[in-house]
């Protein structure tokens, strides 16, 4: 079925639910996982250091959860102007056959409306996407 699942996260509560769901699915089907966090590249050394600390913590949580679930996992941090493009490119470059992501992230959008990143991934990717509400 699925062999390699990409799980984008931003560390939000909804994204964490998508991580949990993606890891459960990966364990069930025997797939490996790549956890990815994409941050927009913004200027300033201090802000960049804060981003590094935040992303390291988020990706460590993904890796630790995968280890506890017995799921092979690698993680990647990408700086990009368009997060959806980085998600799609990573899925393609790494041969992922499923993307599991939250309906929306830190933007605080209503659960009724898909987040802009999720919507753009759904619109432009050729890889199947499982959206977790």
Regions found by a protein language model. Name each.
Residues 124-133:
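Short, acidic/small-residue loops that bind anionic groups at enzyme active sites
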Residues 3-52, 65-74:
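Small/aliphatic-rich secondary-structure junction motif
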Residues 52-60:
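Short, surface-exposed alpha-helical segments at coil->helix boundaries
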Residues 37-38, 102-104, 133:
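Short secondary-structure boundary segments
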Residues 98-124:
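Glycine-rich, Arg-bearing micro-motifs that act as flexible, cationic patches
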């Amino acid at each position: 079925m699925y062999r390699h699942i990409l799980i984008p996260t931003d560390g939000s509560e909804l994204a964490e639910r998508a991580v949990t769901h993606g890891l459960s699915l990966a364990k069930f089907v025997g797939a490996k996982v790549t956890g990815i966090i994409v941050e927009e590249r913004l200027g300033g050394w201090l802000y960049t250091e804060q981003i590094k600390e935040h992303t390291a913590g988020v990706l460590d949580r993904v890796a630790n959860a995968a280890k506890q679930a017995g799921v092979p996992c690698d993680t990647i941090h990408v700086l990009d102007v368009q997060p959806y493009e980085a998600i799609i490119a990573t899925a393609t470059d790494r041969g992922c056959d499923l993307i599991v992501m939250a309906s929306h992230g830190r933007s605080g959008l209503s659960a009724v409306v898909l987040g802009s990143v999720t919507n753009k991934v759904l619109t432009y990717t050729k890889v199947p996407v499982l959206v977790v509400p």
